[in-house]
Amino acid sequence: MRFHTLLFLSFLLLVSCALICTAQHPGLEKSGMFHENVGKGQHIEEKRSCIERMQTCEVEAGLPCCSGAPCICPYIGDCICIQ
């Protein structure tokens, strides 16, 4: 009986870790998205083309991203191009 309880608790721990990781990084499971290629030597703030998180970049608004292709800003990291 103790073995089954320990096995069940281990399973719950693995599932909760997976759920927490997915909740903290919601963009990881989305397919068809690629990171923007940014040249070397740019400052870290210049790499991020979007102003607010999850904002869509627009070339007309002066926010260049992905050579004019649509993109989004994740919570953490560089803009992501939607290919």
Swiss-Prot record:
Residues 1-23 form the signal peptide. Residues 24-48 form a propeptide. Its main location: secreted. GO terms for cellular component: extracellular region. Disulfide bonds join C50-C66, C57-C71, C65-C81. Keywords: Disulfide bond, Ion channel impairing toxin, Knottin, Secreted, Signal, Toxin. It is found in: Secreted. One of its GO terms (molecular function) is toxin activity. The keyword Disulfide bond applies. Expressed by the venom gland. Inhibits TTX-sensitive sodium currents in rat dorsal root ganglion (DRG) neurons. The presence of a 'disulfide through disulfide knot' structurally defines this protein as a knottin. Belongs to the neurotoxin 07 (Beta/delta-agtx) family. 03 (aga-4) subfamily. JZTX sub-subfamily. This is U25-theraphotoxin-Cg1a. The lineage of its organism: Eukaryota, Metazoa, Ecdysozoa, Arthropoda, Chelicerata.
